[in-house]
Amino acid sequence: RKFTTDTEEIECNHHLVDRAWVCSLELEEISSYTKSIARPEGWQFVIDLQNRTGTGYVYSSKYIDDDESLNRFKSWNCNRKMITEPRLIKWKPNILKNPWSDNVVTIGLGQGFIDPLESNGLYLIVFSITMLVKCILKDSSPEAYNRTVRRVQQNNSNYILHHYMLTQRDDTPFWKHYKNLEAPKNVWKNFYDNPNQYTSLYPDAIWAQLGLYFDIPKP
């Protein structure tokens, strides 16, 4: 038996967020939507569940240290009772280059992690399993599987990155970093180049909606 995992990664250096403080708060009124709040060095999510509220501060360790970020996180929740102590989660934004290596297939968080967005992660898990079954049934090569999954992961990375880059906020070094990446032309490029000709997490219409929402001029 041979169990080999390829640990070669594709680094995603433009993505700055690499930490998150998370905790549970006592439930008050239930909102029917998730709140995403821009913060000076990242963003905060607030999700109301049946018996608690989950919240977290996603930030970049390049621009704020863990102690200061914890103090800010607590201050934003000062009017709410914490029912769990804040917990620090760390990661390095990356994509695994070859998730299928010999007789090992990496699926889930080990396959890549960019940003703590649960719906994206769930989709990538389902997609990876579905694609693996198709490849096995068609006797496709691991290289074909890796190429397809890697492309979808990179598409996910690119789409998330554009949400940071297209914002109008530039009042802190964190947001200025993204502002200086000059992303707008890439929005329509993703829409115009080879439309609907390859597997993507975000279809062309989604890129078009992104361009329209942020009022990005067409090339």
Where is each model-derived feature located?
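Predominantly flavin-linked oxidoreductase catalytic cores and closely associated redox partners
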Residues: 1-80, 129
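Generic preference for hydrophobic/aromatic residues in regular secondary structure cores
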Residues: 21, 32-34, 44, 86, ...
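FAD/FMN-dependent oxidoreductases across multiple families
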Residues: 50, 59-167
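Long, low-complexity C-terminal extensions of enzymes
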Residues: 134-219
